[in-house]
Amino acid sequence: SDMRGQFGVRPKETIDRANELLENFAALLKKRGIRVDRPTALNFNQPIATPDWKTKSMFGTMPARDIILTVGKEMLEATMSYRCRWFEYLNYRPLLKQYYNEDPGMRHESAPKPRLTDKSFHMDYLSDKIGVQKRLEWTAKKFFVTTEEEPLFDAADVLRFGKDLMVQHGFTTNLKGIDWLKRHFPNHRVHALNFPGDPYPIHIDATFNALKPGLIINNPNRRLPAEQRKIFEKNDWKIVDAAQPAHNKPPPLCFSSVWLSMN
């Protein structure tokens, strides 16, 4: 996406259009008898800081699935690996409090908040001087922008298959984060996946997605390695290539690749 590294307030007309689409989608769900809850937004266009770092603005509150991992009755706040998303969990705290009060079986958990010091990143990794071919070599070797300084994971790197949790190892989730998930969910089997064809492996939904029991679509440019396919093949899951996106490039102001069409 051309938006990599960009931040700040979006044009009002794009905000109004997005809100219109969101309201229409919420209304459609309500007509079908689905309960729709909305997060409480913060002022994202403000500087934030911890004792270790500061950044000029926050990200937003569009994708709840990035922040909250729901497994059974538990809703787990992910660590997050972007400094600009460090406080994003606050948007969902009112809802989590509400669910906790409504359901005596609900568990609200939070993973250890990372410090995200410079030790957590290879600081020159995203330099514009580094070409795509070099990035593909790095991701094939599982060398990513995040280090193993502390556990890091985004909820959007996790796919749930009953008692199996498939977790993408990439930019936003490291091996310590995957190990933390294994310890936190002892009654689940946690598997690490990686996709060497992706130079910017962030979140699994535009790469690998289950459509129904027994059928998975995989981004044809980011195929799951043969060794990691075995668990699916042994359990009679079919992995097929996803259809090509309708567009060649993302729309203006979009942070995602065209392969978001898979979600």
PLM region spans:
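The feature marks the mature, well-folded catalytic cores of soluble enzymes
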Residues: 1-263
